[in-house]
Amino acid sequence: MSITNEQILDAVAEMSVMQVVELIEAMEEKFGVSAAAAVVAGGAAAGAAVEEQTEFDVILESAGGNKVAVIKAVRGATGLGLKEAKALVDGAPAPLKEGVDKAEADALKAQLEEAGATVAVK
């Protein structure tokens, strides 16, 4: 008579923690294996597993040489008034927009760089 995987799982589920530990030790001894978790070699592999970023912050680093054009671009992008946009540009580096998607962040960066600003997307 053959035992199914489900029957084995049910039997293990009914065991106490000590019984499971003894079972694991017996399996390690019988099959010559170790139940220790495998160690992943290399830090680069771990870095590749990080989720892709979906929200970005657009940071105005500096206004550059054409401050008036940058203020106009900031007003158009954010809907701020003239005074608020000027204060934001004068206070650079400052966050311009936060939590936007990649396409919007790239479009905003291109628009501001065209006006002469230095912009970072993080």
From Swiss-Prot:
<protein>
    <recommendedName>
        <fullName>Large ribosomal subunit protein bL12</fullName>
    </recommendedName>
</protein>
<dbReference type="InterPro" id="IPR013823">
    <property type="entry name" value="Ribosomal_bL12_C"/>
</dbReference>
<dbReference type="Pfam" id="PF00542">
    <property type="entry name" value="Ribosomal_L12"/>
</dbReference>
<comment type="function">
    <text>Forms part of the ribosomal stalk which helps the ribosome interact with GTP-bound translation factors. Is thus essential for accurate translation.</text>
</comment>
<dbReference type="GO" id="GO:0022625">
    <property type="term" value="C:cytosolic large ribosomal subunit"/>
</dbReference>
<dbReference type="InterPro" id="IPR036235">
    <property type="entry name" value="Ribosomal_bL12_oligo_N_sf"/>
</dbReference>
<dbReference type="GO" id="GO:0003735">
    <property type="term" value="F:structural constituent of ribosome"/>
</dbReference>
<dbReference type="InterPro" id="IPR008932">
    <property type="entry name" value="Ribosomal_bL12_oligo"/>
</dbReference>
<comment type="similarity">
    <text>Belongs to the bacterial ribosomal protein bL12 family.</text>
</comment>
<dbReference type="GO" id="GO:0003729">
    <property type="term" value="F:mRNA binding"/>
</dbReference>
<comment type="subunit">
    <text>Homodimer. Part of the ribosomal stalk of the 50S ribosomal subunit. Forms a multimeric L10(L12)X complex, where L10 forms an elongated spine to which 2 to 4 L12 dimers bind in a sequential fashion. Binds GTP-bound translation factors.</text>
</comment>
<dbReference type="Pfam" id="PF16320">
    <property type="entry name" value="Ribosomal_L12_N"/>
</dbReference>
<dbReference type="InterPro" id="IPR000206">
    <property type="entry name" value="Ribosomal_bL12"/>
</dbReference>
<keyword id="KW-0687">Ribonucleoprotein</keyword>
<dbReference type="GO" id="GO:0006412">
    <property type="term" value="P:translation"/>
</dbReference>
<keyword id="KW-0689">Ribosomal protein</keyword>
<dbReference type="InterPro" id="IPR014719">
    <property type="entry name" value="Ribosomal_bL12_C/ClpS-like"/>
</dbReference>
